[in-house]
């Protein structure tokens, strides 16, 4: 397990996360070791918003992980369920559509991600260096408990952190 995987595993254990809900993603798979907690694979990101909401209201910590293109697909689920009903959980978002992107369909959502999160009144934190993943996820959990709404942690490709 490399350092970033270890940092994420440390945060998951420290925050007593019981479930990680995810749509398979090559960027996220480089950060996450599925053996550290119960992993639920989703076919669509919207499923994760509903499941994470249900787990949260039943006092079971969950993290939802998705690509930023998937965030675009489920923004209404956040806006119509989690925000009005004060259901907060951490959402880890892999960032596609950057200058290393080889798939042009990812670029528009790459450009829109931060503004989209802000537009629904949520906070996001960006990971900019290897050593701040644990601290950032811990800060996101504190924010979730304080404001009872989703908090997003934006993860770049590992190449941006080296």
Which functions belong to the PLM regions below?
Residues 1-162:
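Thiamine diphosphate
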């Amino acid at each position: 397990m490399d350092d970033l995987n270890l940092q994420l595993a440390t945060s998951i254990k420290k925050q007593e996360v019981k479930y990680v809900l995810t749509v398979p993603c090559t960027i996220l798979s480089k950060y996450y070791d599925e053996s550290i907690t119960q992993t639920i694979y989703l076919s669509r990101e919207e499923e994760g918003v509903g499941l994470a909401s249900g787990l949260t209201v039943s006092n079971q910590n969950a993290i939802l992980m998705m690509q930023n293109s998937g965030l675009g697909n489920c923004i209404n689920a956040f806006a119509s369920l989690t925000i009005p009903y004060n259901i907060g959980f951490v959402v880890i978002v892999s960032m596609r559509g950057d200058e290393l992107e080889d798939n042009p369909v990812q670029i528009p959502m790459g450009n829109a991600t931060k503004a989209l999160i802000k537009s629904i009144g949520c906070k996001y934190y960006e990971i900019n260096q290897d050593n701040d993943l644990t601290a950032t996820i811990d800060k996101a959990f504190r924010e979730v408990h304080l404001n009872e709404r989703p908090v997003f942690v934006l993860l770049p490709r590992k190449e941006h952190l080296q």
